Amino acid sequence: MSDEATIASLMAAEGGGPQQLNGLVERLSAGGLLRGAREGGRAIGPTALGEILVEDITDDSRAVRPGSLFVAVPGLHVDGHVFVASAAAAGAAAAIVERPLPDVALPQLVVERAAAALAESAAWWFGDPSRRLGVVGITGTDGKTTTSFLAVAALEAADVSCGLVGTVATQIGAVREANPEHTTTPGALLLQRTLRAMASADNDVAVVETTSHGLAADRVRGIAYDIAILTNLTHEHLEFHGSWEAYRDAKLSLFERLAVGPANPVKELGGRRWPKGAIVNADDPNAGAFAGVAQEAGARIVTYGTDSGADVRATHIEEDARRLRIGYEAPSGAAVLDLQLAGRFNVHNALAVVAMGEVLDLDPAAVRAGLAGVRGVPGRMERLAAGQPFGIVIDYAHSPASLEKVLDLLAPLAAARGGGVIAVFGSAGERDTEKRPMMGLIAAERARLVIVTNEDPRGEDPMTILEGIARGAEDGGKRRDRDLFLIADRRRAIEAAFERARPGDIVLLAGKGHEQSIIGPDGPVAYDERQTALAVLAGLGFVPDPAT
């Protein structure tokens, strides 16, 4: 592979060739999605459908070209059915719709769920690339990204070539690039194109961060998963799922997908037989539900954690501000794992990967070596030093549980230095409102100062979001303009934090992490937390030593 290869160039080389539509018709019918086919006001039979040649698939009417199959997906703000006529005018060969449009002279496959049909269409178009890869899906509220980085490191140390789809980065072949988007699990077409590029680049495995959104919205339908990992399950995304039960059920559906069948066969890849395995956090209250679903799917279950009944169990943990040392027992034997990562929460992330190694029968020493080599993950417990007398940590924590874990780590570290924590964070607009006061209370109970600011307000009034967080902080004893400040502009909030920081304090900048933008009412605006913090420090006279 050329040193000049980029993710874009690798992806551009991947596209399905022209295909007869009848192959997709059979697939949609077998999957229980197809309700019929029509053109205008009349039904279309199999013979006519078989004569239609598809040159491309898209769910974006602006990308339609002659021969395209246009999939009309109803969205939260825009319904794709509105654009079927314009797709026809642009030369589309056919459309997939949930409701027939008799006034549009275009062959239409009428389906139960267009999003699910889009995912099946994408898998069909790109030749089911997940069947040529071992696929490791990682789900959970927190810890997915760190666990995915650790999993890739362990697999590569065991001489297993890895691709990665995740919040922070995409990796195809040996090329890894930052993910500029705010979406962890991409849309079905991009996801299947990425998997095909991995297979073409001779990756053996795809490690895929698999979100509840991606599961519930059918983005990952058509992917043949082999390993499913649960990190944990806490309060998040209720604005999308509507209830805790629906959120949990979306996560559970990943483990249901481990069942062997025509769409998810047992794979023989590179001389390795890929088992179906479920890796479950034994310390999570929902462990039993996930293990039960995995058992019904026929997967091998390996649990991990500190619970005495866990298959991979931490027996001894030593930690300092920068490292972890974990003694553990596993089916392959007892061992000690050294990590260049701080935070007791990373014990579970690492043990999940050890458990994955047990299922895949990887060399335990290679797994430990891979884990030991991970020095950090962008935007996760990232320290910033420019000679200032206080600490700065950038972290992606944006849920109540993740914020609590990070503050529980930093508060005693700051206290040992004679200081406290200044927490700078916000909460996403047009998202779960219930978590806002929860996060405010968590910060108030652990931080010396709480500065509430924008995260991604989107179209919601920023001060409404900040007030929701402030209510929780006030319940925790904070008082406005004393130890609680509401500053919508994120740069100004960081300035306020640094100006108030005392020697020994630790300033936590939470919620943005690796992200490269803030989403406002008019869309994303470029923003880099690290560069912003460095610029503020420079204004205070602190500049990093270029030699360090």
Name the predicted role of every residue range.
Residues 97-100, 210, 232, 282, ...:
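Short secondary-structure boundary segments
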Residues 97, 112, 166, 210, ...:
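Short loop/edge segments at beta-strand edges and connector loops
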Residues 98-105, 201, 225-392, 472-473, ...:
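Acidic, Mg2+-coordinating active-site environments of NTP-dependent enzymes
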Residues 1-35, 63-69, 79, 149, ...:
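ATP-dependent carboxylate-amine ligase
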Residues 117-278, 289-297, 543-544:
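Phosphate-binding loop of NTP-binding sites
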Residues 1-124, 278, 300, 310-313, ...:
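N-terminal leader/targeting and accessory segments in enzymes
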Residues 93, 226, 448:
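Receiver (REC) domain switch/active-site residues of two-component response regulators
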Residues 68, 87, 121, 138, ...:
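Residue-level signal for inorganic ion chemistry
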